[in-house]
Amino acid sequence: MFQGASALSLDAKGRMSIPSRHREALQQQAEGRVTLTKHPDGCLLLFPRPEWESFRQRIAALPMDAHWWKRIFLGNAADVEMDGAGRVLIAPELRGAAMLDKEVMLLGMGSHFEVWDAATYAAKEQQAMAQGMPEALKNFSF
């Protein structure tokens, strides 16, 4: 399970260094192989390959009225491998789709990660907190 937020920088080639606390798990779970794709909220999803295969099967099984969402998730997917330094290359098309420049946030979301432009994430987080908790969380015990 992946959790926690990491403020990271992309290098000049568009590579993101995976924090050391997640590298070993990605090596064990997926031999360093990951898949990146677009998310409708404006970030990227980063899956260990076995988790991606499960997600891909669920998306592929969606009915025809979700055909555009299949295109968005599956058509934009890029399989990549961590290099020896624990970096992942994010393709220019995916960097552009998520408006990733230099400063990014990597968020552990359980079985996968989200990759956000740092400024976009900060603005969306502030907006969500200003709106208050959704009904589903109002009776949640912290």
Swiss-Prot record:
Domain SpoVT-AbrB: 5-51, 77-120
Pfam families: MraZ
Family annotation (InterPro entries): MraZ, MraZ_C, MraZ_dom, MraZ_N, MraZ_sf, SpoVT-AbrB_dom, SpoVT-AbrB_sf
Subcellular location per the Swiss-Prot or TrEMBL entry: Cytoplasm, Nucleoid
GO biological process: negative regulation of DNA-templated transcription initiation
GO cellular component assignments: cytoplasm; nucleoid
Cross-referenced PANTHER family: TRANSCRIPTIONAL REGULATOR MRAZ
Subunit structure: Forms oligomers.
Similarity remark: Belongs to the MraZ family.
Name of the protein in question: Transcriptional regulator MraZ
Originating species: Cupriavidus pinatubonensis (strain JMP 134 / LMG 1197) (Cupriavidus necator (strain JMP 134))
